[in-house]
Amino acid sequence: MRGARSAPTTDPQELRRRLAAARPRGLEIDGFRRASVLVPLLYGPDGVEVLFTVRAAKLSSHAGEIAFPGGRLDPGETHVEAALRETEEEVGLVVSEDQVLGRLSDHPSPAGYVATPFVAQVPWPQELTLSPAEVDAVFTVPLDELAAIEPRTRVAELQKYRRLLYSYPWGEYLIWGFTGNVVRDLLEAITNGQAQGHDPFDPE
């Protein structure tokens, strides 16, 4: 039985502390390339929301799936630089490194990437400009409502590895796979300030 989860904090300084205390895990897999994503926490008059994208239906991988903005590193880029660049390119959201509150554990994707997620505080509302080549739509979920969802879990195979996948249903959307696992780590870190759970390849 899962322990009681406290309400997620929205204070930026406390978020920084909890993200650091959660001891994010690095991950290296032979043959996998590096990528990074941004988890935008939108601070607006109605509270804090999390921004998600719906990947373009014409993409060659993960088409139509729910994601965070992000992508592979360009030569010479740091992980955080790549996350911020990709976010601006995909949804037109300009975020500075000063707005980044911390990072979460690395996670692999079936496309052959290991991605590092970064969490950022973003003023809201803002006008977004979506890249039609990459993004069909965006939507937001209030952070407290996201934290209240009881996730579904299943064990899946990634090449020769077994891993536990978390899924969060939200209206017409299902936040799952890589993105669902990042959401799980985010909620574990900012509600209880706990280390980010199982190794992705050790679901027992």
Residue ranges and their predicted role:
Residues 1-126, 135, 156-158, 162-204:
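N-terminal leader/linker segments that precede catalytic domains of diphosphate-processing enzymes
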Residues 130-162:
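Amphipathic alpha-helical blocks and their helix-capping loop/short-beta junctions
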